[in-house]
Design a protein with these regions (language model features):
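Short secondary-structure boundary/capping segments
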Residues: 306, 616-619, 679
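A general structural motif
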Residues: 161, 380, 624, 653-655, ...
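Conserved beta-strand core positions
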Residues: 27, 613, 625, 656, ...
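Glycan-recognition and catalytic cores of secretory/periplasmic carbohydrate-active enzymes
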Residues: 2-609
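Short beta-strand/loop segment at the start of cytosolic alpha/beta domains
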Residues: 609-628
Length: 712
């Protein structure tokens, strides 16, 4: 039996450059999980800078070797040859993807990256679903091809419409482009007119699974689900996601009809899905006739509870409903679901993954359908993400400890340490002798699971501050932006292979299906902008709203973009229809709308309450300007130092004396920028660095800037 792979194969390596050997035209790389590779640059290697949707190819081939500096994170795709010494492998790189123009820069941390991405996503789906520019949802189709074309079926599913409405509403919030809100409003009305049922007898609201459009005036209602896992039942998650788009739209408009629909659907959850016994939680399915979760007609869904029925309320609609209203009832609902998750889902004596499916008494259901005793990697990450959000609303040790535990376990259990990215469904436990959790079907990676990782580690870093969380957030965002964006056609790929190449076969080929609509990609872009700008790079964030007359209760527009760490964000400025407006509570994050206002457009600029770097020009003494620098000096914060330097030069400084007593870190890019300042100003221009910590002083000395400046 062959004991080693004795053939060539192509694959991807993700990692950090540790050195470049010019004589061998090769560089060394260390992966996220600490494994070393030697990478030879093949004769035809080409390199590119990661690009956003809507951007052209950014060729970096000519500068490639100068870019291979220690610390830079990149992707190398190439060929392994079993020709090395003692049977080792040699790796020839064919394609290099660079994540930023300098070694410590990540392009997706630019303040406008996610905003431009959501803009492109919005336009892609508008063109795909409404090519004539008229937002008539009778023309909407669930299934879209990889090119964005409508496929044959005239089936319209409530959840996929709602998810797309969520996307359009989020695109409006980040861009202020009215067409996105018009599409969201039209979709919300269509859902209400064609899918909503108000049961006056039982005082609840529920939503049809789908309709089949027969012609312009005729359709066939599909009440119970016809999706295989949920056939002839009313799944809780479908009722949950029917609210996703309308509630996100409600955050913008305050339309009372949306709030009434949400309240009616919540009564459905509390009346029929909720287990009112001492066991608690929410059942996953109802019988479509009796609304009984224990009905034998439900088969393998009889009296079951799962992650979706308990955990999906929060991200799909409930957090957004609380953000828009501030209603304590919704905060209590959130607390109930997260307390249930924290109590029932951990199973760490048996697996690094949570248990996701249960019987009514919370005993484990490990024989259900496709899931068996398997883990969905993204659900674990989703729990960590949303627990952290909830911790910011109602802090509990149990929320923080479980979120941190998941964050610590998942990289080894669910991520790809060599190539980057996150896997899909794996076996929860290892068999004797196994080191790797076995894949349920394949080692492909789904777009939505990357989203969960990015958002989880971003908010974990923004809330608790651990640098390792930012590392994983950046690596996850790098994989998504490098490999999931269809920069040729638009939209994002459903799945990529383990090596990042698109997988376009079967139901995973298209850009729209029962499983994919405008939700996760838009949610990632929206919250990616929120978390990155306000919590990581500490930059302003702009949001737009269009309140309806008589909409928001007491005329209060709540503008908090998410449940962020308390006191971390404030309102900097507000305009209404382009004119400055001062009636707002900066720290309370709400705007008091004008009494009896009509149709208005509100623009709000949010800023972090603490910034990552301060650089203050303190005047000139003996021709030397004084600039005090505090915080983290990185590519994302260099603009503050540049502003202070510009002020000093404008004041006629013949040199600059930098006070670095408050500086906690200094990137190589910052040192090089100061060297270029010295070069451009000439030999008579003096530089002094005072008060630097030993670590900062070591950075300065190692860069040889001490040859050009006085380092005190």
């Amino acid at each position: 039996m062959t004991r080693r792979i004795d053939f060539t194969f192509s694959d991807l390596i993700a990692g950090y450059v540790t050195g470049f050997d010019q004589s061998r035209d090769s560089f060394s790389l260390v992966t996220s999980d600490g494994r070393d590779f030697d990478v030879r640059l093949s004769a035809n290697v080409y390199a590119e800078l990661v690009r956003n949707l809507g951007e052209p190819f950014h060729d970096a081939t000519g500068q490639l070797r100068s870019l291979l500096v220690p610390g830079r994170f990149l992707y190398a795709y190439g060929v392994f040859y079993p020709d090395g010494k003692d049977g080792s492998y040699l790796f020839d790189a064919k394609h290099i993807v660079i994540l930023g123009r300098s070694e410590n820069e990540f392009a997706f941390e630019r303040s406008d990256w996610w905003m431009r991405q959501i803009h492109e996503l919005g336009d892609f789906f508008l063109k795909a679903e409404f090519p004539e520019g008229v937002y008539d949802y009778r023309e909407y189709r669930t299934s879209l091809s990889d090119m964005g074309g409508k496929l044959g079926s005239a089936r319209q599913e409530a959840d996929t419409i709602s998810r797309l409405v969520y996307g359009f509403a989020s695109a409006f919030m980040l861009t202020g482009e009215d067409r996105f809100l018009e599409a969201a409003d039209a979709g919300t009305k269509y859902l209400r007119d064609y899918f909503r049922v108000v049961d006056a007898n039982q005082n609840v609201t529920y939503w049809y699974h789908a309709i089949d459009v027969v012609d312009a005036k005729t359709d066939q209602k599909i009440f119970a689900s016809e999706f295989g896992d949920d056939y002839d039942a009313i799944p809780c998650y479908e009722q949950i996601y029917a609210l996703a788009g309308p509630v996100q739209t409600y955050r913008i408009t305050g339309d009372p009809a949306i709030l009434a629909d949400a309240e009616g659907t919540i009564r459905l959850f509390d009346t029929f899905f909720k287990d009112k016994s001492e066991q608690g939680g929410y059942f996953s399915h109802l019988d479509p006739v009796t609304f009984d979760p224990r009905s034998p007609s439900l088969g393998h869904n009889q009296a079951r509870k799962n992650w979706n029925s308990v955990g999906d309320h929060a991200p799909a609609y409930l957090i957004n409903l609380w953000l828009a209203t501030g209603n304590n009832a919704y905060a209590n609902f959130l607390e109930y679901t997260f307390d249930t998750i924290a109590e029932r889902f951990p199973d760490y004596e048996n697996s690094p993954f949570v248990q996701e499916k249960f019987f009514a008494d919370w005993s484990k259901d490990q024989s259900w359908g496709w899931q068996q005793n398997r883990a969905v990697v993204g659900h674990n990450l989703k729990i960590a993400w949303n627990l952290t959000r909830m911790h910011n609303l109602k802090p509990k040790d149990g929320y923080e400890s479980l979120a941190r535990k998941i964050a610590a376990l998942m990289p080894a259990a669910g991520s790809d340490g060599q190539r980057g990215g996150w896997y899909d469904v794996v076996e929860r436990t290892l068999e004797p002798g196994q080191k790797h959790h076995r894949f349920a079907w394949h080692d492909r990676k789904a777009w939505w699971q990357q989203e969960q990782a990015i958002l989880a580690y971003l908010i974990l870093n923004g809330t608790f501050g651990d640098g390792v969380y930012l590392k994983y957030a950046r690596e996850s965002a790098a994989f998504y932006n490098a490999w999931f964006l269809d920069t040729s056609v638009g939209g994002v790929y459903f799945n990529v292979l383990a090596n990042g190449h698109p997988y376009e076969l079967g139901t995973e080929r298209g850009k729209g299906s029962h499983s994919m609509s405008g939700y996760h990609s838009f949610e990632l872009a929206y919250l990616g902008a929120v978390y990155t700008n306000l919590l990581v790079t500490r930059q302003p964030l702009n949001l737009w709203f269009k309140p309806k007359k008589g909409g928001f209760k007491d005329g209060i527009l709540r503008v908090s973009p998410d449940i962020l760490p308390p006191g971390s964000v404030r309102i900097e400025a507000v305009t209404i229809d382009g004119a400055p407006y001062a009636d707002f509570d900066a720290d309370g994050l709400f705007v008091r709308l004008p009494a009896d206002h009509g149709d208005i457009k509100v623009h709000v600029q949010l800023v972090p309450t603490t910034i990552a770097l301060t650089a203050e020009f303190g005047g000139i003494e003996d021709a030397m300007a004084r600039i005090a620098v505090s915080g983290d000096l990185s590519p994302n914060t260099m603009r503050h130092l540049n502003d202070a330097i510009e002020a000093a030069l404008s004041a006629g400084a013949a040199g600059i004396r930098f006070d670095l007593a408050g500086l906690t870190s200094m990137s190589s890019e910052a040192v090089r920028a100061i060297l270029m300042l010295k070069q451009h100003r000439g030999p008579a221009f003096r530089l002094e660095f005072n008060g630097a910590s030993p670590a900062i002083r070591a950075v300065l000395v190692s860069s040889d800037i001490s040859d050009e400046a006085l380092v005190g």
